[in-house]
A protein has these predicted regions:
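Intracellular juxtamembrane helix-capping segments at the cytosolic ends
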Residues: 103-118
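Helical-face signature of the major facilitator-like transporter fold
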Residues: 14-18, 22, 50, 91-103, ...
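Small-residue-mediated transmembrane helix hinge/kink sites in multi-pass secondary transporters
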Residues: 58-65, 111, 139-143
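C-terminal ends and interior cores of transmembrane alpha-helices
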Residues: 76-92
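Central cavity-lining transmembrane alpha-helices of secondary-active solute carriers
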Residues: 43-64
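Helix-loop boundary and gating motifs at the non-cytosolic
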Residues: 2-50
Length: 144
């Protein structure tokens, strides 16, 4: 099935947002949340972020299956990510905002990418791969 230009632009936009989301999350985790001498805090942040960002995705997928409103959830996720990363907040509030924001973004972004791609796995691969590039870029920016 052929995908039209408008849909291609939307998938590219979602993929670019994925790069930004994962880059911002990686940078924030390293730059703001791991800054400590305590190994205990590092473990709590690592487990907390990954639990919120990844293990909560089935729950948010279920919620969105029930109520829809993906555009609202996408907007909320981006706001959570900006607030959690751009403002000086307590460590665990920032952790919560970027973790949950990341989870919601991945559910909505993945659904839209699959839907908009109309069976063309190239575009789903684009969405996924730019997220991985974002992780690498966020880590690189932190280290430089």
């Amino acid at each position: 099935m052929k995908i039209n230009t408008s849909l291609k632009v939307k998938v590219w936009l979602l993929s670019f947002l994925h790069l930004l989301v994962d880059g911002i999350c990686a940078y924030t985790v390293f730059n703001r949340l791991y800054i400590t001498e305590s190994n205990t805090i590092i473990v709590i942040v690592f487990i907390g972020y990954n639990t919120l960002a990844f293990l909560s995705q089935p729950l948010f997928g279920y919620i969105m299956d029930k109520i829809g409103r993906e555009n609202i959830f996408l907007t909320i996720s981006l706001i959570m990510l900006v607030v959690g990363s751009a403002f000086s907040l307590p460590r665990y509030l920032s952790l919560f905002l970027i973790g949950i924001g990341n989870a919601i973004f991945h559910i909505v972004g993945g659904k839209y990418s699959i839907y908009l791609s109309r069976g063309r796995l190239t575009y789903l691969g684009l969405f996924v791969s730019l997220g991985a590039c974002g992780l690498a870029l966020g880590t690189y920016v932190y280290k430089s």
